[in-house]
Amino acid sequence: MAQLLLIYNGMFSLNKYCFEKETVKMKNVKVILWGLGAMGGGIGKMLTKKKGVDIVGAIDIGDKIGKSLYDVVPGIVRGDREDVIVGTPEEVIKPGAADIVVVCTNSFTKDVYDKLVFVMEKGMNVITSAEEMAYPQAQEPELAKKLDEIAKKNGESVMGTGINPGLIMDLLVILWTAACEEVNHVTSRRVNSLSPFGPAVMEEQGIGISVEEFNERKANGTMAGHVGFAESTMMICDALGWKWDDFGQDMEPIVTDVDRKSPYGFAAAGQVAGVAMKGWVNIDGERKIDMDHPQQIEPEQVGVHTGDYVILDSVPPVNMVNTPEIEGGIGTMAMIMNCIPHCINAAPGLKTMIDIPVPHAIMGDFRDLIDEDKKIVK
């Protein structure tokens, strides 16, 4: 009996050794950051706190080029990591340089398209914070088709995600419908703060402009407001099998009566501090989806309480309330970081949040979530 136990223990130790040896064969997940603003830099800080993942490249513009990543991103900790020097796309994006590139530079598919193509043609997966890329077929079907073709040709995957679109007003709604036999109407409401977001978002939302300028930009189509209603509603419709045909949206300025200052924006009393957006979808003449999304800098300063709400006229009915809101800045960074393994593992092509497994926090080793045959940097 003692001999059998010794043999068993020896086999167990050998198997344990072999298993551990096998698991350490895979190199850390290699990531390149393209764009080191509030979102890209924040994702970098998050990644340095995780196991099994390395930042191996960084891209930006202006005076950041030639400097250390750990000098240009506030609060990021280098520790004993190798230094990463910020460079140009041509200097950093090389074949086989990384498993995935995180692009945080633009909101619109047409503006980020060339960057995504450049990455894929160098043989790497790419994930972006560009809001329209959460479901680009909604407003840029031709570009979406081209991205899918280029990704498949190069054997890589491309996707966009974030807190919204990407989770709160689309994927979360879709997940709740899984408990329903029938769904008659969807209401999604998000009251959130814009304070964590960077200069690009401040510009898109018109923070600090006059009401007159807001109305002028709205009239000539240069006032972006929230980017994502078309993407979120089409994602919901496609998931549920509804025909997305009659879509509309509107916006009104949120005018502050006190001075408000966020890390990247300022609105004096009488100026625009945010945008109240509404969106809707009618199917066969019947309203099926309503979106309500007021967002502004420093809402708490004027007594506005943030929150996320999903209301389904369904069987059974659903009424989800989360207060305060899931914070948009951290939420967007985390969504992108936590989708990195899914993007790497995905079959080649353009992917969306309804094409990949449900994302989740990664508290262990990134390498444990990567399919070995999908790893680029072996």
Name the predicted role of every residue range.
Residues 262-378:
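C-terminal active-site/capping subdomain that shapes the small-molecule cofactor and substrate pocket
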Residues 122-124, 153-156:
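A short helix->loop->beta-strand "cap" motif at the edges of active sites that frequently abuts
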Residues 131-155:
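Rossmann-fold NAD(P)-binding glycine/threonine-rich loop
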Residues 61, 106, 124, 130-134, ...:
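Short, ordered loop/turn segments at secondary-structure junctions
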Residues 34, 38, 177-301, 326, ...:
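Active-site-lining helix/loop region of Rossmann-like oxidoreductase modules
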Residues 116-140:
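ADP-ribose/adenylate-binding Rossmann-like module
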Residues 3-122, 342:
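N-terminal glycine-/serine-/threonine-rich beta1-alpha1-beta2 phosphate-ribose binding loop
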Residues 167-178:
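Alpha-helical support elements that line or immediately flank enzyme active sites
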